[in-house]
């Protein structure tokens, strides 16, 4: 996120991730904090995907936003999905990656789960589905994309030379499936991690990991501290002794937690 309130926590988390999704507000565009965070990603060679959010609201033109991302964040982008309209006129997303259309039901603001395949964007059925004017505009936009933006390459994405762009509305869970389906397909597998003595590879059997942040007093009933650990290799098991390298002693963890947003559960 681009807001400065997220800054400190996000900087710490970037030491533990293998890939990143950069979220851009369609109305605000690139925010100051986004520029700083993207620079950290660039320094750490972390592959990035851009998600332009809140398409159900009025905002900047899609092409203007991609230009802004390229100029302010110094990224080389190519869209893998593209919006059909915006705000009140938002009709859905054309998935360039899979060549289909996902319609947005404007009145109820609900995602229509069924997608419509369009291998040929010149198919006259398109007018019946989204209307003549939006269909012609979409064809012109896709033609412009093909002429102006580079063809997507997974290798260039993984090396940080090219960043794919997706559009949608996270609040309405719209356009997110396209993003995540592609993410699963192209995102890198866990990378090796340099320790003080050697390079630790993820396929090694012995467990190794590192603490990337510590939170205190997360439970108001207790003066607790939680250490967040990135697993680098092996499999973690509770109640099994593990060596704390800095202290040089074994430690057991009887109630390790896994977090998903605000929800936590014992592993």
Locations of the language-model features?
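Structural and coupling elements of P-loop NTPases
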Residues: 1-267
